[in-house]
Amino acid sequence: MFDIGVNLTSSQFEKDREQVVIRAKLAGVSGILITGTNAQESHQAMLLAQAYPDYCWSTAGVHPHDASQWNDAIAEQLHQMANAACVVSIGECGLDFNRNFSTPEEQEQAFSAQLAIAAELSMPVFLHCRDAHPRFISLLTPWLSQLPAAVVHCFTGNRHELDECLAAGLMIGITGWVCDERRGLELRALLPHIPADRLLVETDAPYLLPRDLRPKPASRRNEPCYLPHIIRQIAEWRGEDATWLGQTTDENARRVFRLA
């Protein structure tokens, strides 16, 4: 099983990153993709991935929250980081009109620029979309023929949005959000509609600790070692064998990010 979304650069992991990786391995997690969310974090993610060769890889990009920082110098930094063998995707990039820490115009500029970089380098993109689906799809679609793959990280949309993402050929990342009996029921109902070869799984650690995890960790911090729990729940709701689903989503991740 492969965790395609871990924020291992988070300060919440500052004191025990080594132990977090060890616990993930002991839990049966076969690989981790470390998320880069701005130039500085992407560089740190790259260094962490290099510290765990053939187990950790990373993305390089600018999250929509940080889109106001976008400039030519950052674009050049992403180009340079993308040359590293452990950097396997451009992102996390996209649109977030829920909180608008950067203006919609700034977000669209940074998103389009990163899609252009990914197309130029023929790299997959690691995508973020929240409360912005129509604009997200309209900006993304013209680039899809030039991209080897596109992953919607932490998908939490509705049936219409899922259908549009699938029709566009996107991979769908599912987190422990689906384990939330308050907010995750709509997403849970959509799980059977995602083809197995388009499904990816992720913890988004240290965020989105599964609410149905027992016993709950005292820290309330999510970790990649909880990925097996998420997979078991997804498999149950899809009517599939958990071991098979873990293997299938692992193969999907390695195909999409060209790790095989």
Curated annotation (Swiss-Prot):
| One Pfam family in the UniProt entry | TatD_DNase
Q: What is its EC number?
A: 3.1.11.-, 3.1.13.-
| Keyword Metal-binding tagged | yes
Instruction: Name the domain of life this protein comes from.
Output: Bacteria
Segment forming the signal sequence: none
User: Sorted alphabetically, which InterPro entries does this protein's record hold?
Assistant: DNase_TatD-rel_CS (IPR018228), Exonuc_TatD (IPR024918), Metal_Hydrolase (IPR032466), TatD-like (IPR001130), TatD-type_Hydrolase (IPR050891)
Q: Which residues bind a divalent metal cation?
A: 92, 128, 153
- What keywords were assigned to this record? Cytoplasm, Exonuclease, Hydrolase, Magnesium, Metal-binding, Nuclease
Give the cofactors, semicolon-separated: Mg(2+)
* NCBIfam families the UniProt entry points to: PRK10425.1
* Family under the similarity heading: Belongs to the metallo-dependent hydrolases superfamily. TatD-type hydrolase family. TatD subfamily.
What is the annotated quaternary arrangement, including any partners?
A: Monomer.
Q: What is this protein called?
A: 3'-5' ssDNA/RNA exonuclease TatD
Q: List the source organism.
A: Pectobacterium atrosepticum (strain SCRI 1043 / ATCC BAA-672)
Q: Which gene encodes it?
A: tatD
